[in-house]
Amino acid sequence: MRPAELPPPDPDALVTSRRLLERIGAELAASGNWISFARYMELVLHEPGLGYYAAGSRKLGSSGDFVTAPELSPLFARTLARQVKEILEPGEAVLEFGAGSGALADVFLQEISVPYFVLETSPELKQRQEQRLGARVRWLDRLPQKFRGVMIANEALDAMPVHAVAWTCAGIVERGVCVDENQLAWSDRGAAGDVLLNAQKIPVEVPPSGRYESELALLARLWMRSLARILERGALLVVDYGFPEREYFHAQRSMGTLACHYRHHVHADPFYLPGLQDVTAHVDFSALARAAAEGGLDLLGYATQAQFLVNCGITEVLGKENPGDPARYLPAAAAAQKLLSPAEMGELFKVLAVGRGVTTSLCGFSNGDRRSAL
């Protein structure tokens, strides 16, 4: 879909977007009219009071821009809780990154009585979580120094800033952002530093067009290493859309994975209404697994969301709904279809588990474990 075909913003939202544009323009003016796309993504998503996750617009649900698995139905949280129960030892806790509306924690805590922590960067979402969850949850401003238990990152990594890179016949360039004719635009520079070093390690074949574009999630790798430092015992479960490296940098994916979400429409222009749309990139699960290994964590499993949920017993969870109550059963069955269908979330979404000191095999990966693909 082209931006011209998208629904118009309301006047107040447009004012916020224009203020953010001024903020971006000021940074560009102070930086020689070029910033990395990772920095641009940080600004449009997280700039205090103005960024997508830092301002007050509604993100989730029918009136927002996208719907996550916990929003669809309690099925996801109830099924995930089965895996978490298997990992947890007495006295341990759960830590969720980016808890959205609080739907996952709400249902999860009906299944398991456990200390539950949330690390949330969005003030608006934190307020919604507080209203929904109350005293059942504790909110953190930063990572704890040590942690024992299970950490959950459900659709948290896709919104972490990424560096945009292009492999060309002339070499590797970093795609940044500039102002051109009073409009935000892409601008190439020769890649350098960590961006160049990491891009050189990827066996990209430059197509006949002479250009292959993609993303490097360097921040996600740092995030993984930081979790490895604090995890004394337990596991991290990452649920997100993405691919192993071989598929991520496939020859047919020469335009990368960047996508923008605005009022349930997906398009490809990251410069449209800055601050009013979500800007995302798919997760490179191979890079994430390597970062975990570098931090001393064990790779516990990797599977499609559909396989993981089936292994954890989603059909049994659905079976607890009464088919004689269509008002409850039919929405639950429809949600299960969306969570499991290869045409919906079942195949594109993956589950990665890494950890330390977990000696039991995890039920979520008992069949269809794709660790060898990483």
Q: What residue ranges belong to the model's regions?
A:
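Catalytic P-loop NTPase motifs of RecA-like helicase/translocase cores
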Residues: 125, 159-160, 245
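A residue-level signal for conserved active-site and pocket-lining positions in enzyme catalytic cores
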Residues: 44, 151, 288
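Rossmann-like AdoMet
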Residues: 1-147, 165, 255, 307, ...
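Long, Lys/Arg- and hydrophobic-enriched amphipathic alpha-helices
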Residues: 200-374
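Acidic active-site catalytic centers that drive phospho-/nucleotidyl reactions
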Residues: 96, 120, 155-158, 240
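Conserved RecA-like P-loop NTPase ATPase core
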Residues: 76, 151, 240
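A mobile, often basic/glycine-rich helix-loop segment
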Residues: 152-201, 251-261
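A short SAM/SAH-binding and catalytic strip from SAM-dependent methyltransferases
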Residues: 145-169, 214-218, 222, 230-237
